[in-house]
Amino acid sequence: MTLSRSPPGGPITTPAGILSRTLPALAGALAVGCVVSACGSEGKGPAPVKTCVSQTCIETVNVTDSGNPPDADTGRGAVDHEFAIGAYEITVGQYLGFLNSVARVPTSPATKALWVKPMQDTASYVSAGLIARTGSGTDADPFVYTEIPDIALGASSSRRGILNISWFSAARFANWLQNGATAAASTETGAYTLNGATSGVIARNPGALWWIPTEDEWYKAAYYDPTKPGDNKYWEYPTRSDALPTGEAFPGGVNSANYNAAMPELKKITPTGAYTSSVSHYGTYDQAGLLWEWNDAVYQDFEGVPTTRGLRGGSWSLGMINVSKFGPRDYEPTYDDDDTGFRLATTRK
């Protein structure tokens, strides 16, 4: 999907068959409607399926109902195929295994950039960082990556969402899975032909087995619900609700999320799936909070040159506009801030 960037508040034009919309749609973003518990949708979603590639296991949910219509409000969400998507964002533990497989003796700037120093730094949002790196990165003294645990979370510490992730790091993780998730698995070919690239806009290859979801795939997994009352089968928020989620500490209720600085200082990076009752129709968690998530949308600059990639969802740091279906964002694919993460899509399981 290629989108054209416009001045703030202006229209974003989209391909034929996708409706234009104006952003931000503040009136829609603040609408209050049917809450989950009042709509008969209360409870958890479908159980995830665990898929393991070598030693890396990812829990996914199937997104069915292919050929669904787009959202009447935004024109987003129509998908003509079935697929699976991560029930959760990629975690510290999963990313740690990736680093120790492919980035111990990095041979290119692209591989070295899979880890960035903020991952180990103390900050206002995390007590002591997430992943530490030691060593020199040479054959004689390879890098070793270790989790910096949050003792209070116990075994759930490694399930915290991994952050400071660029689009390129997410794409290399997808390639690694595609190629077997071993130390010998390439990060440069597979779902995406990267060949050392650290800039530019790169399309997904046909036949990908794991990939960064398209804007419509991500959107459908978050908001679509064929059982929703009324004509438009899309909720406004990824918690099966048309009411703004409550930003509060986990586990919360049926319409809660980690966004808008809801968690205490040093404890803002929560385990994925910690809001156990706040779930989409298909069974995804945390699309309303924890981290912004990369998608595969491509945005053009004012001269029509593709420059940026899409992000969606709420984050631990941001407020209500980004939580709703009316709040897409885009950044350069090198962007790797403290509230950017990702989940992957795959073939139906």
What are these regions (language model features)?
Residues 199-205, 209, 250-288, 332:
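Short, well-ordered junction/capping motifs at the entry into regular secondary structure
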Residues 277-280, 304-349:
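Disulfide-stabilized, aromatic/cysteine-rich ligand-recognition loop
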Residues 1-20:
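N-terminal secretory signal peptides that target proteins for export/translocation
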Residues 71, 295-305:
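Cytochrome P450 core scaffold surrounding the K-helix E-X-X-R motif
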Residues 48-73, 81, 199-203, 207-212:
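GGW-centered surface loops in extracellular recognition modules
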Residues 2-3, 32-59:
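Bacterial Sec-dependent N-terminal signal peptides
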Residues 69-84, 248-260, 321-335:
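Short, polar loop/linker segments at the starts of domains and inter-domain junctions
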Residues 77, 84-215, 221-248, 300:
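Active-site microenvironments of metalloenzymes and redox enzymes
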